[in-house]
From Swiss-Prot:
<keyword id="KW-0813">Transport</keyword>
<keyword id="KW-0472">Membrane</keyword>
<keyword id="KW-0406">Ion transport</keyword>
<dbReference type="GO" id="GO:0046930">
    <property type="term" value="C:pore complex"/>
</dbReference>
<dbReference type="Pfam" id="PF05538">
    <property type="entry name" value="Campylo_MOMP"/>
</dbReference>
<keyword id="KW-1134">Transmembrane beta strand</keyword>
<dbReference type="GO" id="GO:0015288">
    <property type="term" value="F:porin activity"/>
</dbReference>
<comment type="subunit">
    <text>Homotrimer and monomer.</text>
</comment>
<keyword id="KW-0998">Cell outer membrane</keyword>
<keyword id="KW-0732">Signal</keyword>
<dbReference type="GO" id="GO:0007155">
    <property type="term" value="P:cell adhesion"/>
</dbReference>
<keyword id="KW-0626">Porin</keyword>
<feature type="signal peptide">
    <location>
        <begin position="1"/>
        <end position="22"/>
    </location>
</feature>
<dbReference type="GO" id="GO:0009279">
    <property type="term" value="C:cell outer membrane"/>
</dbReference>
<dbReference type="InterPro" id="IPR008439">
    <property type="entry name" value="Campylo_MOMP"/>
</dbReference>
<keyword id="KW-0812">Transmembrane</keyword>
<protein>
    <recommendedName>
        <fullName>Major outer membrane protein</fullName>
    </recommendedName>
</protein>
Amino acid sequence: MKLVKLSLVAALAAGAFSAANATPLEEAIKDVDVSGVLRYRYDTGNFDKNFVNNSNLNNSKQDHKYRAQVNFSAAIADNFKAFVQFDYNAADGGYGANGIKNDQKGLFVRQLYLTYTNEDVATSVIAGKQQLNLIWTDNAIDGLVGTGVKVVNNSIDGLTLAAFAVDSFMAAEQGADLLEHSNISTTSNQAPFKVDSVGNLYGAAAVGSYDLAGGQFNPQLWLAYWDQVAFFYAVDAAYSTTIFDGINWTLEGAYLGNSLDSELDDKTHANGNLFALKGSIEVNGWDASLGGLYYGDKEKASTVVIEDQGNLGSLLAGEEIFYTTGSRLNGDTGRNIFGYVTGGYTFNETVRVGADFVYGGTKTEAANHLGGGKKLEAVARVDYKYSPKLNFSAFYSYVNLDQGVNTNESADHSTVRLQALYKF
């Protein structure tokens, strides 16, 4: 009994001491920055009887998808900041036996890292669980997260230097978007690009931004080694300028390649290469672009990115054609050549109405030539910028696989997406 009393007294004393030394709430939150994203999507997709269902395309059935991220960044000591991101990701609705209902899904900690900044040498060290934001990974709100260290230096005007090391990845969040899972199943041993195991990822990058000949020149160089997978390299360069009076012109090109690790250098895998080029123009509310890309191997599985479509959105068009079998950037068998044109008009700098048209094909020597043939996609889209923080958008996409080795008749897939996006 005496021990219990002493323990209780000690606990009360410790509680009193803790309360006396607690940081007042007003002082605790004065250096905390809060930001985040709220996103709602309505998705529905339809496959005709000739189209083999592919989970990388939109197979939603009137699904309501919710995504919320809240970020807290706080200065915790001289030169140190802590960052935590809470994420909510759920989908409800649909019909049939596979209808979705997870409305009670909760928040989880998606990112958690510490940043040390030394202003004297313009260098930051970021350590912890963080979104990678590489050229080979998606840089949007659902990009690949890994645990590691990143060092960023800005001591040279117009040039950012970075080095990174990652020893684990949040693979479950990405599903079929992650390399080695890029097929209708998310089971790695059924993926076109098979990886028995993966090691650490090490890399470096140089990203520049320079005034050149009256325009803006933005070059990038990326190098990375993913143990037991491949040595990756990428070059991207974009030049923007104004010609004549009020005509904005941009030209961007990129090359992404890799050399496979010896463990994957066999008769089923090939080194990956991608060449992409795009030119765009804007004048008096009108915008248009013309581009094309070449990638893949017709006999063996290859990849050009690590996750989803990488950070190559500015060099692509359409919504779903680059997710079709044989054409996936994150691991597939097929040699692909595509060209595209986009255009649109923006009313009062708030509402844009536009369209994309992508046409090309895939040549493959895979079993039964799976994924091969001519392909096209047509997209109609509307975007409404209600305010700097709130945007509404919608698109309708139609994908067609021409009659060929995979279908006795042409196969169609269509999808509709409505979205509301708020950033704060």
